[in-house]
């Protein structure tokens, strides 16, 4: 990101693209985006714009912070474990307590209830102050591989 006061969606988008490249997947292979959702206007807007540019409006996007709070340094690991569980259960959790999404999120598919996770792949974002960006692609294990 450009700065803490003015995050830029381009590095966020590139981070997700690089994760997809490493996984040898395309955006259309991803069935769910687990957003970092910092809860800051600037951070959430940059992440929402980057997700919309890369995945469009059809891929479900939610955050788990409404379920467990922002656990600071542990948030990435805890949310990653929850994403593994969602893949195994083939169900994705909506963002809890999201009553009025910001206008900047209007181009995203924000599920309001638990949905089936049709795809065998998801991407999980984790971002920190100063431009420390991390996106991880998870794929469901199959015995074919």
Pin down the residues of each PLM region:
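Conserved "HGTGT" condensation-loop signature of ketosynthase/thiolase-family condensing enzymes
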Residues: 1-145
